[in-house]
């Protein structure tokens, strides 16, 4: 392999690597500038044109008219386009990336819309805090939720019963203590009366 063929292969390799760096993202643009191939008159965007010339017109790529600036070029046409019109690669790449950003935004909006519809169908709270009014709670789901509440409800009743028992006991004590005092009073009076009777009977006998 001679030096010219090696140089030619190295040029092809570096050119293909550079074109891969500016590789476009799939999808059509609203406006995309196209250029006619100087050898077969087919139209391509700037990246497609360079790839087409590299693939189809490698041997005849010298001494052609540049489709961008319409000047006759004495060197390799692809090398001329990449060196003198490199801004077109960047511009096309920006357009593609901008379109891909728009597509991703649209897909996100569609996803949010789908999730919002799903939340409304299931009766969950929406993002602005409102609840779907048309959805009624499922009785089957509520029956699964309610047992936990009913199991925890007897505890307050038990505490209530204990407090009521204590209050009743206190009332009993209050009622019992006056009765016992009265009994004691009556017993004391009776004993005094009996003592008087006995003393009077004794004194009468004397």
UniProtKB/Swiss-Prot annotation:
GO terms for cellular component: nucleus. The modification Phosphoserine is found at residue 107. Induction: By drought stress, but not by abscisic acid. Residues 143-161 have a biased composition (Polar residues). It comes from the Eukaryota. Expressed in seedlings, roots, leaves, stems, flowers and siliques. Keywords: Nucleus, Phosphoprotein. The modification Phosphothreonine is found at residue 105. It is found in: Nucleus. Its main location: nucleus. Pfam families: Di19_C (PF14571), zf-Di19 (PF05605). Phosphorylated within the NLS/NES region. InterPro entries: DI19, Di19_C, Di19_Zn-bd. Residues 142-167 are annotated as: Disordered. Interacts with ADO2/LKP2, CPK11 and CPK4. Weak interaction with CPK12 and no interactions with CPK1, CPK5 or CPK26. Belongs to the Di19 family. The NLS/NES region (98-121) is necessary and sufficient for interaction with CPK11. This is Protein DEHYDRATION-INDUCED 19. It comes from Arabidopsis thaliana (Mouse-ear cress). The gene is DI19-1.
